[in-house]
Amino acid sequence: MDKNLLKRFAIESKKDLTKKIETKIKSFFIDEKFEETQIGDIYYLTNNVHTLTLIPEDYKKRKLLIDRVNKLGLIQVIEEATFTWFNRIIALRYMEIHDYLPLTKNNESLGIRVLSSTDNTPIPEIMKFTNLVNPELDIDFKKEKYVELKDDNEKFKYVLLLVCKKLGNVIPQVFDGMTDYIDILIPDYLLNETGFVNKLITEIPEDNYEQVEIIGWLYQYYNQIEKDKAMATKNAYQKNEIPYVTQLFTPDWIVKYMIENSLGRYYIEHNSDSYTPIINKFKYLIKDNICFKSENTNVESITFLEDRKSVV
């Protein structure tokens, strides 16, 4: 895993996505005066420069976006949308490489990639029409709407939103289906040479995804600039700065070390007959001073809790 590459990619991508989403959010006349007209089901919002055309669904999402901006402020909503799309697309990339995407009604994989193609063509596999009309693909795909869209970037955004909505029912922590105001801020031109998806595919080789740790490292590097600024300027932090200086990614070996020398040691000491088979599997256990207890403990009865103060 090339951590220097991941760091550079995460920092540059955050800057680029932030600019694009800031431009996108302002295109919805969030803080501008405009004239609104409605013809049939279509809404037209016009200022002195251009006209924004919205279908009823997007008109509703725009109102939700305005409510969110009024509640949190423009800057925080931009940060929220930027991270959400960064996080979603990184997760999709990891899952498609490992064939984890639950795209059927039974949440099983179809072996179809969403962001890329195994034959290295620039169009993602899911956009091939035979895949879109696959009866096992459980997304709310509308052929007529797809055909009406102007270019591959618009078609891809349409399909990507459908996939995220599907995954929101399976992995709501990442693909929350209740973020309509963020959905309309999906970045444009994702498949272009300088688009986030294209750069993700072309700049980070697939072998970097062999370990799930890549997601943790990208998350840490995504926050690197804010973390460095906060730590360099003060000893006391504002509420919004605390995550940057406290939420650090824990590498896999540290997690294993902590578990093997806490829960693992406790279990071995209370189950002496399990010592040999378990000890051969534990790579990080400190074997000195293991004191066996007379009573056995059922592993299912052990509560393992991590909190802010300690690991029990």
Region locations from a protein language model:
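Preference for the N-terminal adenyl/adenosyl cofactor-binding alpha/beta module
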Residues: M1-V312
